[in-house]
Amino acid sequence: MGSRFGRRKERNGDMLPLYESQSPQHLDSLENENDERISKLTGKVKSLKELTMNIGTEITSSTKLMESMNDSFDSTKSLLSGTMTRLKNVSKNGGISIWMWLAFFCLVALILVLVRF
């Protein structure tokens, strides 16, 4: 009969560790079961490691893409800012309001889009 500390009494009253009281075949089957579980666990750990590495690679590439997009937006912002400043100067000096220029550019953009498609 097993005790709560993993020991078992022999007929002569000695206490033996529970693993010594098991048959060798049973111990071999337990060892094989442990080996199978270890190999499954190793496979899962490898899969998680690969997934983590892929996530890291994706994060790195996404960060680079966002940085390049940020640089592009900054250059576009400065270009548009300069264009708007020049447009304001032209509209003030030429007597044509900025709204007329805006309507003109929208019309040109619309024509370009319609011609393209």
Curated annotation (Swiss-Prot):
Family matches, as SUPFAM superfamilies: SNARE fusion complex
Domain of life per record: Eukaryota
Occurrences of domain t-SNARE coiled-coil homology (ranges): 28-90
GO MF, one example: SNAP receptor activity
SMART domains, alphabetized: t_SNARE (SM00397)
Keywords: Coiled coil, Endoplasmic reticulum, ER-Golgi transport, Golgi apparatus, Membrane, Protein transport, Transmembrane, Transmembrane helix, Transport
Stored PROSITE patterns: T_SNARE
GO annotation, biological process: endoplasmic reticulum to Golgi vesicle-mediated transport; intracellular protein transport
Subcellular location: Golgi apparatus membrane; Endoplasmic reticulum membrane
Transmembrane segments annotated in the record for this chain: 95-115
GO cellular component: endoplasmic reticulum; endoplasmic reticulum membrane; fungal-type vacuole membrane; Golgi apparatus; Golgi membrane
Membrane topology: Single-pass type IV membrane protein
Principal subcellular localization: Golgi
Spans within the Cytoplasmic topological domain: 1-94
Family, similarity comment: Belongs to the BET1 family.
The protein's role, per its UniProt record: SNARE required for targeting and fusion of ER-derived transport vesicles with the Golgi complex.
Quaternary structure and partners: Component of a SNARE complex consisting of sed5, bos1, bet1 and sec22 or ykt6.
Protein name from the UniProt record: Protein transport protein bet1
Organism: Schizosaccharomyces pombe (strain 972 / ATCC 24843)
Gene name tied to this protein: bet1
